[in-house]
Amino acid sequence: MERRPLHLHLLLFFSAWLLLLLLQGVSSLQFRREDFPDGFAFGAGTAAYQYEGAAAEDGRTPSIWDTYTHSGRHPEDGTGDVASDGYHKYKEDVKLMTEIGLEAYRFTISWSRLIPSGRGAVNPKGLQFYNNMINELVKAGIQIQVALYHSDLPQSLQDEYGGWINPKIVDDFTAYADVCFREFGDRVAHWTTVLEPNVMAQGCYDTGILPPNHCSYPFGNNCTGGNSTVEPYLFIHHNLLAHASAVRLYREKYQVAQKGIIGINMYSLWFYPLTDSAEDIGATERAKQFMYGWILHPLVFGDYPETIKKVVGSRLPFFSNHESELVTNAFDFIGLNHYSSVYTSNNNNVVKAPLQDLTADIATLFRATKNDTPTPEFLPGNTVDPQGLENALEYIRENYGNLTIYIQENGSGAPDGTLDDVERINYLQKYIAATLKAIRNGANVKGYSMWSFIDIYEIFGGYNSWHYGLVAVDFGSTERRRQPRRSASWYSDFLKNNAPIRVEDGSFVSAASHAQL
């Protein structure tokens, strides 16, 4: 028998060893709808100003969003006057939800439609609209998840006392929540008080790029008033107090009979330090405190994080003993809106000054990719990084306990509104897989809703923005014609037919068919 040279044996050995390493490094996961825990609900969402339209119909009065868009300050110079026309087409939309197989639908209520003066008399037409839509969802067997507020304060309250920067908002918000709980709570499974306050603080009250368009020089331009050094902190403080007040009301007056749950929502970016320098690592941790700790630390521990207290100093409101007790544990769940991750670095241009704004307090630069031009504001990235969602969930678990979490928004837009949205399907598969992996690693995630059910008037881009909907809307038509995208068929196959998603080596490939609805 012929002997092989030693170098050949070594070559074969190292080849086999390398192949084994490569195989071990291949991530392989195949899963179906049935692999998620009992009680887990898949859904999609919309928001009132962006979806309903009918801005001046049936007693609705202007919100701060109406004022902002009609002032011409919106970058696309459009308004939500018609939006997706959900006010008139909700029955058609619920039928589409049923055809897709949505298990849950998260929408927001327009405070200005339900209580046009901000407080006091309830608008019968507004009440009828929400009751009718909720009843359609009940008939369809779709779980109802309602958010009370998404940056659309009645303009009357903004004019009267400055809205969220005034403590009077706590009582008015609680009274508004009381109406919602009383009128709709027998059919609502989940209540979310406020959406994304942690990033609205910057956009609404520091840079002023969102309503009520508040900022102060030199921190922002072309604003209607404001003080960038203190108003972001007043906004968050009163959000937390209003949220906690509504939670206490719900628990004391409604929860036992209605058997729903209540929580608050946060925007969630994940952060990677641009370099391994101490400065960039410090900036990353600071960004996490302002993104997560600003909301979660008071809700879990009764006070703001030490990092924020140290940076902001006397500009940061404080909780009285009573308020600290009120906010602590004032939630049944936390909602996360998570889309992407960013790279973070220390903002060396920030000079410590007696008065500085929220952006300077964060003192961090953000990049969607390492080579992007940095920005000092919390702005959504466009990277596809499902590991970032897993990291965010693990960070929350390590720092605040294994809280009940609902992924309330996650999605990807298409710039041209294409119906053949394969990239969106790939994105959604990756993040749904990441959600399942996080659950298997111990995260207490109870639901996932993609953004959005239907094309809407987008916050930053209006009608000319990227389109996020499972269902396309022809905004050029007066009828606002609907047409399901390929992603709607894929989601339907996953939800209704238990079609598998296969994950191989970082590539997420659906085995589901794409039959048209």
UniProtKB/Swiss-Prot annotation:
The protein's Enzyme Commission number: 3.2.1.21
Signal sequence residues: 1-28
Keywords from the named record: Disulfide bond, Glycoprotein, Glycosidase, Hydrolase, Signal
Residues engaged in binding a beta-D-glucoside: Q50, H150, Y339, E409, W451, Y468
Gene3D superfamilies reported for this sequence: Glycosidases
Top-level division of the source organism's lineage: Eukaryota
Glycan-bearing residues: N222, N227, N402, N410
Disulfide bridge partners, by residue number: C215-C223
One example GO MF annotation: beta-galactosidase activity
Classification via SUPFAM superfamilies: (Trans)glycosidases (SSF51445)
Alphabetized PROSITE patterns for the sequence: GLYCOSYL_HYDROL_F1_2
Reaction(s) catalysed (UniProt annotation): Hydrolysis of terminal, non-reducing beta-D-glucosyl residues with release of beta-D-glucose
Positions annotated as active site in the UniProt record: E196 (proton donor), E409 (nucleophile)
Entry keyword annotation includes Zinc: no
InterPro entries for the chain: Glyco_hydro_1, Glyco_hydro_1_N_CS, Glycoside_hydrolase_SF
Any one biological process term the GO annotation gives: carbohydrate metabolic process
Family in the record: Belongs to the glycosyl hydrolase 1 family.
Name used for this protein in its record: Beta-glucosidase 20
Protein species of origin: Oryza sativa subsp. japonica
